[in-house]
Amino acid sequence: MAKATDAPLITELQLANWHISHPEIAEFLDSRDVQDQWESAIKDQGSRGRVLVCERDLALVGVAAIEFEGQLGQLSLLEVTPTCRRQLIGSRLLNAVADIAGRAGASSIYSWVATADTPAQEFLESTGFTHTGATRTIGFQDGASELLSDQMHMSTNLDNRA
């Protein structure tokens, strides 16, 4: 599980990855606000969710966050440092999240994935997630700027995971 001292590193990893995969969102994010949210999430770990990290050679290389809503677990974040991808870090984090969710009473895990984020979709599909058909657009329009992100809903049943 993540420690309070991990919040700045999680923020750095998330923002660096989002500048690559979600630049339209990343440009609007304030690093201090993101770090505050991670500090709060780490402090509040327990029955409502967990934040997991993966370290290699004392460096944070992956993070996953799960939130519980009754029998549902929401995978709210799964990020791996680009230079460490395809080394099973994401798979291990996702398996740990599934174990934690199952022990917390969840029967399935879902995630909202940007429709343009094909690598994330393919990764989740390779681990048993399927598209549910649900979509959403999130963001804001304030006259001066616009941020809209089209997302698709993906889920997996924990009973069917190997």
Where do the language-model regions lie?
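Conserved catalytic-core motifs of GNAT/GCN5-like acyltransferases
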Residues: 112-113, 121, 130-146
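A short beta-loop-alpha structural element at the N-terminal edge
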Residues: 1-12
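A short helix-loop-beta-strand connector motif used in the catalytic cores of GNAT acetyltransferases and
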Residues: 39-53, 74
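Conserved GNAT-fold acetyl-CoA-binding loop/helix
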Residues: 15-40
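Conserved acetyl-CoA binding element of GNAT-fold acetyltransferases
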Residues: 71-82, 91, 112
